[in-house]
Swiss-Prot record:
The gene is twf2. Pfam families: Cofilin_ADF. Belongs to the actin-binding proteins ADF family. Twinfilin subfamily. It comes from Danio rerio (Zebrafish). This is Twinfilin-2. Keywords: Actin-binding, Cytoplasm, Cytoskeleton, Repeat. InterPro entries: ADF-H, ADF-H/Gelsolin-like_dom_sf, Twinfilin.
Length: 347
């Protein structure tokens, strides 16, 4: 799923004027897939005295936003700013994804050289004045990161701060984490203990959870029939087989997405939740996933296909600078080459 968001001319011109430091705070919102000006505040006191009274009233518990907050310090380009991504837990998933993916666009439009610090928050405590001071401390010392700072770090690492921009450059959204429901957790534990050999999971897009569909015993020949034709699914399959004389039980993860018969929302959510689900499965349930597959149809899941994916054929390495052997039987008689003397003296 690719998205392109447009920066309105009003916002672009306002950001250009604001860089000279006349304002204290700028709020940016997404409306109708456009980046628009939400609110603007002038400075009244020093940056720290203005901070909570000016910033906190703009935090909607149900809607994300970006906030550019002007500090009183300067660098070579002018006043330094704090860039805040506000994404409350109760806001809709689609909004969270849009704001997460458009972060880099807003920063680029404003001018990254003016931004001194960045923060990510889901509750007021994350980005209030005390939260910012904690953030500064954590950046200057090897102290444990807060949950919000870990989330910001993860966003940077996974490149969700993507080029969804005016240019237009595109990037997929990734990295949401829906919680596993109790039955799904129980099934994963049973798979880790080898008490079952198949799990099918689905996303509940309304409740924003990962739910168990079933754990029916499944052989390789049954596997294609487990892939729905009209909806995405996550599958974990215990692939029992022999390889080079050894009996193996390899966990294979299958993400099935049946073409474009699914809604855009489903495609976005399943794609975005996949990596975080796998991280949790490997970390919390100690399930080592031997192979991760993405398919659009169960027809692909043959025994030969699974074997080749889990054990890809290794290409023989060519010996460096090896001289080719001559044709067999055409080498002629061997010759003895002696030195300058009959007794082997040096020539």
């Amino acid at each position: 799923m690719f998205l392109v968001l447009v920066v309105t001319e009003e916002l672009r011109e306002f950001l250009a004027r604001a860089r000279n430091g006349t304002g204290r705070l700028i709020q940016v919102l997404i409306r109708d897939e456009q980046l628009v000006l939400g609110a603007y505040r002038e400075p009244r006191h020093s940056w720290d005295k203005d901070y909570d009274p000016v910033l906190l009233p703009l935090l909607d518990p149900l809607e994300p936003c970006y906030i550019l907050y002007r500090l009183d310090s300067k660098n070579a380009q002018g006043y330094e700013w704090l860039f805040i991504s506000w994404s409350p837990d109760q806001s809709p998933v689609r909004q969270k994804m849009l704001y997460a993916a458009t972060r880099a666009t807003v920063k680029k439009e404003f001018g990254g050289g003016h931004v001194k610090d960045e923060m990510f928050g889901t509750v007021e405590e994350d980005i209030c004045l005390q939260g910012y001071l904690r953030h500064i401390t954590s950046c200057s010392a090897p102290a444990p990161l807060t949950v919000a700072e870990q989330e910001l770090q993860r966003i940077k690492i996974t490149e969700v701060k993507a080029e969804i921009s005016v240019d237009p450059k595109h990037q997929t959204l990734q990295g949401l984490a829906f919680p596993l429901q109790a039955e799904a957790k129980r099934a994963l534990k049973q798979l880790a203990e080898r008490r079952i050999n198949y799990i099918q999971l689905k996303l509940d897009t309304e409740k924003e959870t990962i739910d168990l569909v079933h754990t029916s015993p499944t052989d390789i020949r049954d596997l294609p029939c487990r892939i729905p034709l009209d909806t995405p699914r996550y599958h974990f399959f215990l692939y029992k087989h022999s390889h080079e004389g050894d009996y193996l039980e390899s966990v294979v993860f299958i993400y099935s997405m049946p073409g474009y018969s699914c809604s855009i929302k489903e495609r976005m959510l399943y794609s975005s939740c996949k990596s975080r689900l796998l991280d949790e499965v490997e970390r919390d349930f100690h399930l080592e996933v031997a192979k991760k597959l993405e398919i659009d149809s169960g027809e692909e899941l043959t025994e030969e296909y699974l074997y080749d994916e889990v054990h890809p054929k290794q290409h023989a390495h060519k010996q460096a600078f090896a001289k080719p052997r001559g044709p067999a039987g055409k080498r002629g008689n061997k010759r003895l080459i002696k030195g300058g003397g009959e007794n082997g003296g040096n020539s």
